Design a protein with these regions (language model features):
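ABC family nucleotide-binding domain
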Residues: 1-169
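Conserved beta-strand-loop-alpha-helix hinge in the C-terminal portion
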Residues: 161, 165, 173-185
Length: 185
C-alpha cells in the first residue's frame, strides 16, 4: 500500500493513476505531495490523528490544504463524522476518544477529499462488527457516488465477502476469487 500510495518510491516498473504517469522505471514524474493530497485517500491501521487539533479540524485539514474554503471543508468533515456516528465528538481532542472513535475519525479524514483512490490498511480492525459493516457500507457509498477505487487490506473475515473483487496473497503469490460484492463494486 505504501508503494501504491507513493509514500515509498518504486524502484522499477511503471505506475499510472488514471491517465497520469506517476513512476516510470523508478523515476518520479509527478509531484508526489500533491498526488497524495489530491488523488489518494489513506486510512491507516493506526489513526495518526494530530493531537493538538480537535476532531473536526483533523478531518477538515486536508481539504483546506488542497484549497477548499474552510466552511466547505468543515461542512464535509461534519457530514462524514455524522455518517460514521462520531459527530457528537466533533469538538473533542484525539486523546479524549476511544480507539474505535479515533479510527472512525481517521476514516473520515481519508474520505473527506473525495479522492479517486482510497488505500485502507485494516480500516475495521478496532471496530465492533456492527460498526465495521457500517464503515464498509460508507466506503461502498463513496465508491459509487464519487467513482472512487478502494483498495482494502484486511484480515477481518466478516467484511471480505462484501467486496466484488478479492485477492489473497499466499506465499508471495496473488490469487483472485469472486466476492459477493454487496457493499463495494
Amino acid at each position: 500500500l505504501r508503494c501504491l500510495g507513493a509514500v515509498i518510491d518504486a524502484t522499477a516498473g511503471r505506475m499510472t493513476l488514471g491517465d497520469e504517469l506517476v513512476y516510470d522505471d523508478g523515476w518520479k514524474v509527478r509531484a508526489l505531495r500533491a498526488l497524495r493530497r489530491d488523488k489518494i485517500g489513506f486510512v491507516f491501521q493506526a489513526p495518526y490523528l494530530i493531537p493538538f487539533l480537535d476532531v473536526t479540524d483533523n478531518v477538515a485539514l486536508l481539504p483546506m490544504l488542497a484549497g477548499v474554503p474552510n466552511d466547505e471543508a468543515r461542512k464535509r468533515a461534519l457530514e462524514l463524522l455524522t455518517a460514521l456516528d462520531v459527530q457528537h465528538r466533533a469538538q473533542a481532542m484525539p486523546a479524549q476518544l476511544s480507539g474505535g472513535e479515533q479510527q472512525r475519525v481517521a476514516i473520515a479524514r481519508g474520505l473527506v477529499n473525495r479522492p479517486p483512490v482510497i488505500l485502507a490498511d485494516e480500516p475495521t480492525a478496532p471496530l465492533d462488527s456492527q460498526r465495521a459493516m457500517a464503515v464498509v457500507r460508507i466506503l461502498g457509498d463513496m465508491a459509487r457516488k464519487y467513482q472512487t477505487a478502494i483498495i482494502v487490506v484486511t484480515h477481518d473475515e466478516k467484511i471480505i465477502p462484501t467486496f466484488k473483487r478479492i485477492y489473497h496473497i499466499r506465499d508471495g503469490v496473488t490469487h483472485e476469487e469472486a466476492g459477493e460484492g454487496r457493499a463495494l463494486d
